[in-house]
Amino acid sequence: MSAHGGVGTSPAVLPKSGIVARTWLALSAVVLLVLCAGDYRVLDYRLLTAPSPPAGQNVELSGGWKLTSATGLPADGATVSAAGYDDAAWTAVPRMPATVLGILQDAGVYPNLYYGTNLLTEVPQDLYLQDWWYRTTFSAPAGFATYLLDFPGINYRAEIWLNGRRIAGSDRIVGMYADHQLDVTSSIAPGGLNTLAVKITPERAVQGLDGVELADSWYDWINWRYLGHRDGVSFVSDRNAGVWKPVHLRAFGEVGIGPAAVTTELPLPATDSARLTVYADVRNHSAVSVRGVLRATITREGKDTVRVEQPVSLEPDERREIAYSPDEFPQLTLIRPDLWWPYTLGRPDLYDLRIDFLQNRTPTATAALRFGVRTVHGVRGAGGDGDFSLRVNGRDLLVRGATYTPDLLYSYDPDRDAAILRYARDLGVNMLRLESKIASERFVEMADEMGIPLMYGWMCCNQWERWQQWDGEDHRVARDSLASQIAMLRPHASVFLWANASDGRPPEDVRLAYRRILEDLYWPNAVVDTVSSFARAPDGTPLWDGIEMAGPYSWRPPSYWFAGRYRAARGSSAEQGDNEHIPPFASLRSFIPPDKLWPINDTWYFHAGANPGNAGLTSIRRVIDLRYGTSTSAEMFADKAQLAHYESTRAQFESFAAGGWDSHKMTIYWMLNGHWPSFFGNIFDYYLRPGGAYYGAKKGLRPLSVVFDSYATGEHRQAHVRVVNQGPDDRKGLRVRVRIYDLSGRVRDDRRAEGIAVESGGVAAALTLGPGPTDSPVFFVRAELLEPDGTRLTENVYWQSRQIDDLGPPENDTAFATTQVSWADMTALNTIARPRMNITARAGESAGEVTVRLSNPSPTVAFFYRAELLTSPDSDEILPIEYDDNYVTVFPHETAEIQGRVPPGGPTPGWVRVTGYGGEPTVVPVD
């Protein structure tokens, strides 16, 4: 369950004048119920000391909702929220939470919005100019003194009505990221049916024309030539308006417990003890004085229980912060604690904290959260090319991450998020960045459990960085929003970094207000004020925190990342990658209509990013045409694109390990996943179909790997091969073997190195290679890393051209374009011999597992073979899916294996389709 959600403790802040006050929350639920059309569905139950009544209830209002436009609706809020109001003509909401356009798509009003240009041609573009009513009825549990409605995500303004009474107006309920807690005790009907109505007013301001509103922006993530307002204000037709995060009713007694926090001190470099400090807010909601005991209990299986308590007296309506420090309570110094580590370095162990307010030894309020014992520090070095790094538990963390995005319509889908996070772990990325687009708390909880570090912060370029256009309300909303998100994020072990801005740096009044909120809420992690090097003081002095965003945002050849002459390929970068990403053909045909598949046309551009350098897919078309040859179909073009994405993405991640810690500390790929079927940068697409970038990244992110630098230095006359170790343990006695094959499959060079030692987090030189064969226009470099006994640990296969890729001088390294002075010629791969492969598939011992064997009986190279698990011979690939490797190359008279696995709950694979580059597919049954 949630760090808070298991007992109804989602942190929040009530909007106040000036700096936002810490929220008062009834974190007293012990039974988590989900209200679904008037019925309770028990999700989690934690037994208290019988026969005491429950300390509280947390009811998610997820069912029975309806939606309608307020345009032309004569009824006011009092009428709409009254019992018996006839909403039969309204649109039934299939699932909540949901934005307006998300509901209209799910309900079939505007179906299949992501296909072709439907998002433009099939939807009225003025949905954001209308107000919208959300309405539901629910039963409120009886027997409690206080009832709160919690709205953690409303976009953008709202009136809240309950049982014919207005609870809050749109002057108070404003801000996409502000959490609103509303006391509805005087308006609710305990034990009876209640009617809730929410009138949503979408974001309407257009920056540069009539100010801003602090919602969120897709900026160049969608093409503003088609969607939104030209020149930088892109949006879908409802502007993501609606109730986009879960709504809860919280019922409790006289005392509520506010958002709790735990901070950790480690005696670094030692980690054999930990000093914990626990913070909790308590509030007396009654009109009489209350006395009790506040108890904090920390548990973890296999560890001694820690319990601390102190008496508390509260006057009527008094709220107070209670702290438990290890100086006062020695038991809060843990001996030999289980630490939370990123999954690449260890186990992400979690502890449970429960806080009870007891009266007469009976809990009357309860809060709970899960936390990790760990420390995170940001370190700023003296380097000039970006020199910010993160240290976890005293250990340097080389960040090789990617940027997560929710769905374009902000669909709430924890199962999809779980699949995305599993992909992140399967890939090997060790950080996910969220540039606003702050998803539900469930996303953070899953990251805690999986050991995936997260970086959060505000969006670039639009509302959040147009400070000169902010009015008084915007400043208030900004403070409320930050306090809400920090209160939600701070207990979570996976959250490592908060950025107060992206491309810009807040003006001093805003920056100081942000910093005060972070300090007041005991933010235990790293903070930066900008993640770029663009900001300047009035005298021209750079104002930055060691992180930069110099790109590139277009494809680069592998040698670029190792050359050492391009600034963007080193240092600490918050985003870089390829903003023109072509998915596998199976995905391409899922969103481009058949008559628009080829040649590339406006329907493709509709699904591209907005930056002029990316909107026409200019760079990736140039790359594919000049390096792999012109295409005659969309399928041919997409197949070639997988080669290009594989080699470039692999090189980006490899270089940030092989380049050494002194000059390489952070690279975050732009982006991890697709927010809709799109050509905007991603490692895997909206359909969760892994392509060339995925398996290239997976190779580049192997914790222990052998890396070839694509002859990046020495004018293509010498290449360096290195061993990188991003695993948790030092290694020694390793062996490296590198062979060069020509196009006919003959071995033209064979070199070995032995006795290689490489420490954790380090890199070691293995050997150098001379030029490849002069009589083979393309050749293969096969690099193997072996255990001391010769067992293969990993293999990397690189294809190289006699004609080199050369970006030219650093001045050519423009962020949004690929301009080279010479291009590799890979066209010989189009006519390479395609051997007849022997392919078999065998079911594994566990459900959903399949081993695919690819045997090459010929003397030629079998190049770039992809396996797909299927349910039937002609079906689409099962998705989501995991393979230990794919797009494999099988050398003469050898056999390769691919291990495939369908995640639990997925269909049973019965067939496998295998396709080599430029060849026809082979389909075999799973035995």
Locations of regions flagged by a protein language model:
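Extended carbohydrate-recognition surfaces in non-catalytic/accessory domains of CAZymes
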Residues: 40-150, 224-255, 382-383, 608-640, ...
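Substrate-binding/catalytic cleft of secreted carbohydrate-active enzymes
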Residues: 431-615, 627, 640, 644, ...
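Active-site-adjacent substrate/metal-binding segments within catalytic domains
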Residues: 101-139, 144-151, 155-162, 168-174, ...
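Short acidic/polar inter-strand loop motif in beta-rich domains
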Residues: 201-208, 358-364, 785-794, 919-923
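Extended acidic/polar, glycine-enriched regions
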Residues: 189-193, 279-382
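Accessory beta-strand-rich segments of carbohydrate-active enzymes
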Residues: 43, 47, 66-72, 124-256, ...
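Low-complexity, Pro/Ser/Thr- and charge-rich linker/hinge segments at domain boundaries
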Residues: 219-236, 254-261, 374-391, 803-824
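Carbohydrate-binding surfaces of carbohydrate-active enzymes
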Residues: 50-53, 280-285, 360, 601-886, ...
